[in-house]
Each structure stands twice: as C-alpha cells, then as structure tokens.
Amino acid sequence: MPVTKHDAMKAYFEPKVIELVGDLLSFNFSPESPDSIAFVTNYSDKVLKKYIRIGAEKEYGFSIIITKAYSTSADDLNLEAMNFAQAFMDWVDEQDRKKDYPDFPDHCQIKKIENLQNMPNLAGINAKEGLARYMLQCRVVYFEKER
C-alpha cells in the first residue's frame, strides 16, 4: 500500500500514462519532450469542512501537464494534441463515475475525483522546439478521520 497521498496519486495515474505514452509519469517536473505527462502537486489537506472530534472533509489539488508536438502550420497536429488532453480529462471523469479512486491511507475515504474545468488549458508553447503544454487542473475530495 502506498505510504503517502503523493505515493497514492503517482501509483494511480502511472498505469494510464504508461498505456498512453509508453513512459513513466514525471512527478513535480514537466520535461521538454513530446508525449510526456507530468503530475504537479498544487495543494494537499486543504480543509473544506471540519467536523469536531470526527475529522474533516479535505481536498488534494493537482495538475496534469501533457507535452505534445506543436505546429504553426494549418495542419491538425494541435487539434490532435487538444483532443488527446481532452480524452485524458474524460478518463478522469470516467474514473469518478466508476468510483475508481487512488488508494489513500486507511484513515481517508475518497468522495470524488474531478476536473476543475471543462477543457484543457494551453499552458504554453515552445515554438523553437515545436512543443506545447496542455494543463488539466483536478482535485480529490476526501474525508480524513481524526487520529
């Protein structure tokens, strides 16, 4: 079983990343290489609602950064990249519908995993290298028992 929430999140996303791009998930680092996917932490244990002597509803925020080839031509490369990133968002939504969640520590019960937007952001381009970064912002909402 993973030791921390960070371990759980990496273990949760890594099989999907390997399936999609045949490479490991980068953690808190987004490489300048096409077809790379990074997991970037935003915040953890943010309290949404506190229950005295019971625990708290909390959230774990993160971003998925997808680096794809970028084109300044009138081809469909950028559209294909956007559709790839959108499909990753759709996969996150599907996992929530199936209630297939990361394996957080025993004192935590996940309520949902969700995208915080309805489409990926074009987070930046490197025209010289022909790369674009697409960002998906997400969160896990969970209940953590007081220990």
Feature annotation, model-predicted:
Residues 1-28, 46-147:
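Charged, amphipathic alpha-helical segments and their flanking helix caps
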Residues 32-50:
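Amphipathic, interaction-prone secondary-structure segments
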